[in-house]
Curated annotation (Swiss-Prot):
Keywords: Cytoplasm, Methyltransferase, rRNA processing, S-adenosyl-L-methionine, Transferase. Its EC number is 2.1.1.177. It catalyses: pseudouridine(1915) in 23S rRNA + S-adenosyl-L-methionine = N(3)-methylpseudouridine(1915) in 23S rRNA + S-adenosyl-L-homocysteine + H(+). Homodimer. Belongs to the RNA methyltransferase RlmH family. InterPro entries: Alpha/beta_knot_MTases, RlmH-like, tRNA_m1G_MTases_N. It is found in: Cytoplasm. Gene3D superfamilies: 3.40.1280.10. This is Ribosomal RNA large subunit methyltransferase H. It comes from Sulfurovum sp. (strain NBC37-1). HAMAP family: 23SrRNA_methyltr_H.
């Protein structure tokens, strides 16, 4: 199984969260190969200075090239909240799963409509770096639920 976490976020070594991301990638290896793809370019930076709508369009343009294969799931605070068991079902029986974390202004509705699903981790606002860690933990938890591993107890 292959899981991609595709996020609109500046690339770079984050000394606080990066070790946690690497930890979850490593412990997920028996179940899936997890890759984090960070996207941020001059076009996105410029669009964010113009307007929220321009920013969303630039996010869609950057993210759409990853929509081609597998199950596509956007993290969207306005979407359905899921618990860990519902989240695990999203991973079950899939060869490739792509998770999308939008930029500061979220997703265009058109991008969300191109995804197979959109889920929320709740109504609180989390930084991109922190939501990436939460997603990585939930991916590992979901994989362990699906494989009857004792982690989820």
């Amino acid at each position: 199984m292959k899981i991609n976490v595709i996020i609109i976020d500046k690339k770079g070594k984050d000394q606080l969260y990066a070790p946690l991301i690497e930890h979850y990638k490593k412990i997920s290896k028996p179940f899936a190969k997890v890759e984090v793809i960070e996207l941020f370019d001059k076009e996105i930076a410029k669009a964010q200075d113009i307007s929220p709508e321009a920013a969303q369009r630039s996010y869609s343009k950057a993210l759409e090239k990853y929509l081609g294969s597998g199950i596509n799931i956007a993290l969207d605070p306005a979407s359905k909240e899921v618990d860990s068991f519902e989240f695990a079902k999203l991973l079950k029986d899939s060869v490739t799963v792509n998770f999308y974390i939008g930029g500061a202004y979220g997703f265009e509705r058109d991008f969300l409509s191109k995804c197979n699903n959109a889920v929320s981790f709740g109504k609180i606002t989390l930084s991109h770096k922190l939501v990436k860690v939460v997603l990585m933990e939930q991916i590992f938890r979901g994989l362990t639920i699906n494989h009857n591993h004792p982690y989820h107890k």
